[in-house]
Curated annotation (Swiss-Prot):
Recorded superkingdom: Bacteria
Cofactor: Mg(2+)
Catalysis: reaction(s): 2 ATP = 3',3'-c-di-AMP + 2 diphosphate
Database matches in HAMAP family: DisA (MF_01438)
Name of protein: DNA integrity scanning protein DisA
Sequence ranges assigned to domain DAC in this UniProt record: 6-144
Family recorded in the similarity comment: Belongs to the DisA family.
Subunit structure: Homooctamer.
Entry binding sites for ATP: 73, 91, 104-108
Amino acid sequence: MRLEKGMKIKDTLKIMCPGTQLREGLENILRAKTGGLIVIGDNKEVMDTVDGGFNLNSDYSPSYVYELAKMDGAIVISEDLKKIVCANAQLIPDPSIVTHETGTRHRTAHRIAKQTNNIVIAISQRRNIITVYKGDIKYVLRDSSVILARANQAIQTLEKYVSVLERVINNLNLLEFQDLTTLFDVVTAIQRTEMVMRIVEEINMYILELGNEGRLISMQLNELVKHIERDGILLIRDYCKDEDGHNEVYEQIQKLSATELLDLDAIARVLGHAGESLVDTLISAKGYRILGKVPRIPSTVIENLIKEFKELNSVIEADIDELDIVEGIGEARAKAIKDGLKRIREQILLNKKI
């Protein structure tokens, strides 16, 4: 599984993506060029900073928020976004809280967000932008057309990266069946998989920002990546020295910086092959990835096969009688494994995806 990065801002963006009632209210204020300051949540920490204004406790409505924003003060909305608690309020945060924002509205918003850890939204009257604050995080909401253009560009980039990854993986598949895989081939495949997954993460952020306008981008993304992450994890499991630590290895690869990811030796170190020559070191696959592509073979049977034979090449060379003695494999399943591996080999030789 991918590491959850930026969860705070992701959860925040979900409640104000296009198509939501909150976003509609924000867009109305933006179009009217009145500016505004909105706090989400009416807990004690927030209400202690509120001075003046008037209590409403009225049902939330985008048009109500738009009308109330015409006044100078802040609007406080309940945590569940169902009630407008108060309007035209003056917010008095702790002045000792450091902020580098300019403009009274944005300085107040940043300080309130830091002080209460609530979501605070500042809508600029002159610059016509929506800025979201949550704790120390600041995020500028962009127009849907801008995000859509960037998402489409990212999808085009992803298509090229997936195409390169497929060529690398097909080459690796061929070498695995010939038992000629080098450390260079393995780390290149892992590097390319991680590059693809990082672009996927970026596109997922765009989809989150687009809300219901991001459905087509989401469909394109799902069609492009399919089982890439799963195969990447199995690839790591095939080649990392500590078989039980493959999930930790995957996490370490995700934590590599963009510069470190370009260094194949750095990836080899994470796999447990530090100091080994990338080109000269032959390395055999355990077989999790290829055996996982054989139809109707449970993961427990794959585990038993690898426990018995240690390497993929030993499984390929084993006859039906040798396969039959493995726990969970009868004669019928042994034949299915032999036939399945034969078909996969033929597909690889024909340069087809498996």
